[in-house]
């Protein structure tokens, strides 16, 4: 639950924040006012909105997917690939497929085993054993 001083206007919340210097309090107040304005805009009917969020979102998607080189010599797509490879949100296919940056650690004769969708013999045996144990109780 929010303290009573933090409820109400964004300016009151910024003023109630302890030990903020005036610049930080002003920045916080500005951010909270902008946030309130966006929420109010979303609450209004679609045709009365002040900003076209869908167009902005599409423009940002196009910008982020475009391959534009910066001064570092790396393109955005190369940066995105390395970020994608270092992410924890891989699918099994991405984890088990080699990439250009993956060192060739596995020899051609050693291939990792993948579990198959119908490969449940150990689980079935465990469940059958559990059923027998429960039946004997």
Swiss-Prot record:
One of its GO terms (cellular component) is nucleoplasm. Residues 1-20, 57-80 are annotated as: Disordered. Detected in brain, heart and liver (at protein level). Highly expressed in liver, skeletal muscle, kidney and pancreas. Detected at lower levels in heart, brain and placenta. Detected in aorta endothelial cells. Overexpressed in colon, breast, prostate, bladder, lung, and ovarian cancer tissues. Its main location: cytoplasm. This is Regulator of cell cycle RGCC. Pfam families: RGCC (PF15151). Modulates the activity of cell cycle-specific kinases. Enhances CDK1 activity. May contribute to the regulation of the cell cycle. May inhibit growth of glioma cells by promoting arrest of mitotic progression at the G2/M transition. Fibrogenic factor contributing to the pathogenesis of renal fibrosis through fibroblast activation. Interacts with SMAD3. Interacts with CDK1 and PLK1. It is found in: Cytoplasm; Nucleus; Cytoplasm, Cytoskeleton, Microtubule organizing center, Centrosome. The modification Phosphoserine is found at residues 67, 69, 71, 75, 91, 97. The keyword Cell cycle applies. GO terms for biological process: cellular response to hypoxia; complement receptor mediated signaling pathway; fibroblast activation; negative regulation of angiogenesis; negative regulation of blood vessel endothelial cell migration; negative regulation of cell population proliferation; negative regulation of cell-cell adhesion mediated by cadherin; negative regulation of cytokine production. InterPro entries: RGCC. Keywords: Cell cycle, Cytoplasm, Cytoskeleton, Nucleus, Phosphoprotein.
């Amino acid at each position: 639950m929010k303290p009573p001083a933090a409820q109400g206007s964004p300016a009151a919340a910024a003023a109630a924040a302890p030990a903020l210097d005036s610049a930080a309090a002003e920045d916080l107040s500005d951010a909270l006012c902008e946030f309130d304005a966006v929420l109010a805009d979303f609450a209004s009917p679609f045709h009365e909105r002040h900003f076209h969020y869908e167009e902005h979102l599409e423009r940002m998607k196009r910008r982020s997917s475009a391959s534009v080189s910066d001064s570092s010599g790396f393109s955005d797509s190369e940066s995105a690939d390395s970020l994608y490879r270092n992410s924890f949100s891989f699918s099994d296919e991405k984890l088990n497929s080699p990439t250009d940056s993956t060192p060739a650690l596995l020899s051609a004769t050693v291939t990792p085993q993948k579990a198959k969708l119908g490969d449940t013999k150990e689980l079935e045996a465990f469940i059958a054993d559990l059923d027998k144990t429960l039946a004997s109780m």
